[in-house]
Design a protein with these regions (language model features):
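Membrane-proximal helix-loop-helix interfaces that form the catalytic/acceptor-binding platform
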Residues: 14-158, 165-203, 212, 225-528
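Conserved cytosolic catalytic headpiece of P-type ATPases
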Residues: 208-210
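Short, Lys/Arg-rich, polar N-terminal cytosolic tail immediately upstream
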Residues: 1-9
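Targeting/processing segments of secretory and organellar proteins
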Residues: 2, 205-206, 216, 221-223
């Protein structure tokens, strides 16, 4: 019996970690198919219908690089293109993010902090939410963790030259994959550049009384400056990034085109006083700050206060604690830089989900603080952990309540449910949908009940796929006229009872009310052939 207990004790951390992963998977997959796909997911689902060259083209006129779409197409070849299948790729990267975070923290700290960090990530409302969405955010989070691990092994930790070389290669691959997946991933390597500059400056200051910021004041320390830059670009730091830049050359013309387009036309609202509070509130509770009550606000402020006080004390007592400041850098600097880059005269690009890569490091940072506090302030540490767990569990319940609600202005998408309502009336109904809503509806087209496009395609470049001949359009396809009747589903306030085809007359209408608050969401119009 003692031997069994001893073995169990040795395997306890492994069992705990498997329990954490299992819990995360249960939470994610329990409701992964509950919501109808919304526009961003629908764009992902639609673009993978094309070949790789066409995906490259249609991505180039949108706002993201193509790597995620390439992977999603390959994934769909094995697992299908249902909502469940497409979202499962994000769940896969969500799990990998937690696993990689565990091994990163175990390497730089210890097993106890690694388990707590994994636990925080497993119940993180934001990580759960975007592990259920057919978009690239969890893939970027995974690549960000991999990048930081590779950076640490290649340029911070004591390692053999062979290991350093291996991790430099992994770093190059991770950074390449990241910037070919989402542009804002670049905030992670930029944060590492800043950390490395300060890290080398501090080491040089310790040895030679060199101050990086005194150089910026143009003091005469030419030898020290030369030494700083020599150390900074040493260990193949510069050459590694030159390789990354070289491998990115094929996409640079498209990046420039997209950047110009985003500056001229983009949907993201300008920054205001609620931007940061909303980001913080969504991280903890998956709820905008304006919708929280006094108690939730108090919980968030208490957590933030503990983080700020601990960080300040850390700065005062251990100025050269590189590992803590590495995690702090990739937690905070991306948020700060994205905020600055979104200020006028630039177009705002500040969206919570774009910062998921930084938020996973915030969870790691909180785990580090919690365990370190436990060493001499147990009651504060326990309170800190309890508040985080409570906030995240509350956020998970909010996730379930808000299924089908986009964070883009609270837009509700239940097009799958509306289509099911039509098919309940007529099993093999021909259904027409216009505008960008077509992308979401097309996901639910089948051979018995086809989804068609009607009207003028959207003027934005993301509507180019609709303009393609691939898209079935009722005005251009004579086979559509074989239908004795058809249905149009449109947003409730933009329904038009005039038939888009002269061969049909309006017959009747139905309302589809959303399942969240009962308000009218879509108008369903029935047309019968003359």
């Amino acid at each position: 019996m003692g031997m069994v207990f001893s073995r169990f004790k040795k395997c306890r951390s492994k069992i705990s970690f498997l329990g954490i992963i299992s819990g995360f998977l249960a939470i994610v997959f329990l409701t992964i198919s509950k919501a109808s796909i919304w526009f961003d997911e629908a764009f992902s689902a639609y673009i993978i219908r094309f070949n790789f060259a066409e995906i490259w083209h249609y991505t180039s006129v949108d706002v993201h690089p193509p790597l995620y779409y390439f992977l999603l197409k390959i994934w769909s070849a094995f697992f299908g293109s249902s909502d469940f299948a497409l979202r499962s790729l994000s769940a896969f990267f969500g799990v990998l993010t937690i696993i990689l975070a565990y091994f990163l923290v175990k390497r730089i700290y210890n097993k106890k902090i690694a388990l707590l960090a994994s636990s925080f990530l497993a119940i993180s409302p934001m990580l759960i939410r975007y592990s259920q969405e057919a978009r690239m955010y969890t893939m970027v989070a995974f690549l960000s963790i991999l990048t930081v691990r590779a950076f640490h092994e290649a340029w911070v930790a004591e390692n053999t030259m062979k290991n350093k070389k291996k991790w430099r290669i992994i770093y190059i691959i991770a950074v390449c994959a990241g910037i070919w997946t989402q542009y804002l991933y670049a905030l992670i390597p930029i944060s590492l550049w800043i950390f490395r500059a300060v890290y080398i400056s501090k080491n040089q200051e310790k040895n030679n009384r060199f101050h990086l910021f005194s150089c910026l004041k143009f003091q005469k320390q030419k030898n020290s400056v030369r030494q700083f830059f020599s150390n900074f670009f040493a260990e193949k730091w510069l050459s590694s990034h030159l390789i990354v830049a070289f491998l990115y050359i094929p996409w640079i013309p498209f990046f420039i085109s997209q950047a110009t387009y985003v500056k001229a036309k983009f949907w993201i609202p300008a920054l205001d006083f609620t931007t940061i509070p909303n980001m913080i509130s969504n991280f903890f509770f998956y709820l905008d700050a304006g919708k929280t009550n006094g108690w939730l606000s108090l919980i968030a402020m208490a957590i933030l206060l503990i983080i700020v006080i601990f960080t300040f004390e850390k700065w005062r007592s251990e100025k050269n604690n590189s590992i803590f400041w590495l995690i702090f850098s990739v937690s905070v600097i991306p948020i700060f830089l994205l905020y600055i880059a979104s200020l006028p005269p630039f177009s705002s690009i500040f969206v919570d989900r774009y910062l998921l890569m930084a938020e996973v490091f915030v969870s790691i940072l909180m785990a580090i603080i919690a365990v370190k506090l436990f060493e001499n302030k147990k009651s504060v540490s326990i309170l800190f952990i309890v508040l985080i767990i409570f906030s995240h569990i509350f956020g998970i319940f909010q996730l379930n309540l808000q299924k089908g609600i986009s964070k883009n202005g609270g837009e509700i998408t239940e097009i799958r449910q509306a289509i099911e309502k039509v098919r309940n009336e007529k099993n093999n109904a021909a259904i027409a949908v216009g505008g960008f809503l077509y992308y979401s509806a097309a996901q639910y087209s089948n051979n018995e009940s086809k989804i068609w496009f009607y009207g003028e395609p959207p003027i934005y470049r993301s509507g180019d796929m609709i303009r393609a001949d691939y898209t079935p359009k009722i005005e251009n396809d004579s086979s559509f006229l074989k239908n004795k009747e058809f249905f149009i589903i449109s947003p409730y306030n933009s329904a038009d009872k005039e038939s888009p085809i002269s061969d049909y007359n309006f017959s009747e209408e139905m309302d589809y009310n959303n399942s969240l608050n009962g308000d009218p969401l879509y108008k369903i119009l029935k047309f019968i052939k003359k």
